[in-house]
């Protein structure tokens, strides 16, 4: 797909999303898909109760459109095993996120799927992704001419990475506009890389995510009119993971998605220290780390703006790795 075609597709998707979001928001509100707030969360979040959620459903439409356009451009001869694996991976995580949002609405509390159920579904989705896409995956990670990881170890680490990164995106979705704004430069670079070095439909899925982010920010900026819910956050993480392995940018993705890894690591550190200290010590006032800054008194829009800047810096560092060791 040429840069012109990709840009036109992105523009059309973003404009269509902007036009369709008001109807989706109304539908979600009427269907009872509204946000429930945890009691232990920051006090400022309690005013957000009742906001429509599961706005990530719009991303499903974008993925379908990108898929149809790709099939049309390649005349039906371009779909590879990796592309099919990527579509399955994104679809399973998006639907599991929607199920989680739906269960929260049905139970009338902020607890949908149990933690182990989420991890099990995500692990199965990742296993399916690598099983279906394996013949077309490189199966190794290299730095220049040096092979750092290969064989079974590659797939073991890749599974952990896939599940971890999907959850990292989910953990970042905690403030109005935070995940959409921080993932926007990530998907912009991923899309540019996919156009410069084509890697099939899986490589173009970031275009669907980028268009979603652009439109979603219009309605999710403080104060939010809609939340993406687990439906959106898990799907965005899945798109990033699919692009990572389809493009062979495993090392660079650690930097491109660095901000999300920081969010996930803050939770891991907090939980580990809390348990090892006999529930007496915490490293952060609250985890993920964006809530730590909330507790310090930072305004929500300041946190979002500064995390966006941090994400841009991580992405630029990732671009250096992409260009230096491709």
Positions of the model-derived regions?
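Short flexible/disordered coil segments
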Residues: 100, 287, 323-324
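Membrane-proximal soluble regions of multi-pass membrane proteins
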Residues: 22, 29-38, 258-306
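Juxtamembrane boundary at the C-terminal end of a transmembrane helix
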Residues: 317-326
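Short linear loop/turn motifs
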Residues: 39-46, 303-313
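"…together with the soluble PPM/PP2C metallo-phosphatase catalytic core" -> "…together
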Residues: 2-262
